[in-house]
């Protein structure tokens, strides 16, 4: 493409990507990677990939590693609910707000690889489910996607970000492993993540790929975890399940709030779905 070349401080060749309309990380570094040949979704440098982590794919995966990651996500999320019930509400709310945005993975619809976390009010609304629903209070959630069917404005992007945030420690190691395999340059970077053992947000300095313009760390995600829409989602629940199951006419858009309220009072319907 007639792109000029220049050198980074670590002497890795980096391509001037001004000629690329939507440069991926492989274009940026001039590394000939084919998406079909690598395990991870090759990220764009300046915008999100319009895909999302579907936790259900980890749950149903034949890989024990994927199953283990799903279990760790559910366990950590339910422990957050326990924290909320144990009079540590401020810490639980603060943590959920942090978990609700995982910009480093670059998944979603942002054209700047940067979204916004949920509000304090929305975080409290989610955590209140651990008080309001008896089954959740006693046993926790089996799938975090269930939250989409219970709280307004919580959808696939939030579910994906929460899952990625709770797996961020794994994704850091995974990214480093894949970068070393394909010769992708790494730079010293500070990155925060939720430590599930300490039950707190910690910061680590490690070597990761970065966007030099924004200095944002970049994390890779296994492509087998990604879908455009999660297996468990509101539209499927509304169109394919709830109307047929309770035999009642609903306008899913107009009455979405009423359906979410119905779900909170009939959580057994959600679990059956």
PLM features: residue spans?
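Long, contiguous, compositionally biased segments that the model treats as domain-scale units
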Residues: 7-185
